[in-house]
């Protein structure tokens, strides 16, 4: 039987993020995933070049590509709901785990271990701070883009995400914030 795995993954583009917020531009999971992958790779490169890190930037990028794929089956749960209380957070984590397992089971047997390891990365704990930071930086970038259009809806979200990323104490994220984040506030003409 033909595998449904990549057909299911292609549906990332139909899942919009920030469901409780008024958006001037809807961001889908596919867009967010690509941004997160770029940023995760950059964070690991920064860590290698500035702080002597030993992780593989490409591995970080691929982990980031798969970091939200379970949401194809669970949907993108708004953050205030996802973290409303410990019981809800635990239940959502269990739903994500179950969705990840279901996705992995759609892979042919000869691909389950390699690709499944990206979907449910049990052995990549040292990469997770970089993936989480990239995820938060992608959210901050979305907030900046919305703020640039005059949408005040994302100001508090930007502050919350920035506070959370600072609390991670990930030096590479601080370098990214200083070196790359300011450019996201520029217009197209200013970028050229």
Positions of PLM-derived features:
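Alpha-helical, largely C-terminal catalytic domains
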Residues: 1-192
């Amino acid at each position: 039987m033909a595998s449904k795995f990549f057909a299911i993954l292609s549906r990332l583009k139909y899942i919009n993020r920030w469901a409780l917020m008024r958006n001037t531009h809807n961001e889908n999971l596919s867009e967010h995933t690509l941004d997160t992958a770029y940023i995760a790779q950059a964070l690991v490169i920064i860590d290698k070049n500035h702080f002597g890190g030993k992780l593989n930037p490409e591995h970080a990028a691929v982990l980031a590509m798969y970091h939200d794929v379970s949401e194809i089956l669970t949907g993108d749960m708004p953050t205030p709901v996802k973290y409303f209380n410990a019981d809800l957070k635990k239940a959502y984590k269990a739903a994500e785990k179950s969705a990840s397992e279901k996705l992995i089971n759609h892979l042919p047997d000869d691909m389950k271990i390699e690709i499944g390891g990206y979907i449910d990365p049990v052995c990549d704990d040292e990469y997770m701070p970089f993936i989480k930071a990239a995820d938060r930086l992608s959210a901050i970038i979305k907030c900046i883009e919305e703020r640039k259009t005059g949408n005040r809806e994302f100001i508090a979200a930007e502050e919350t995400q920035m506070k959370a990323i600072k609390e991670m104490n990930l030096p590479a994220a601080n370098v990214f914030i200083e070196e790359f984040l300011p450019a996201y506030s520029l217009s197209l003409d200013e970028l050229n």
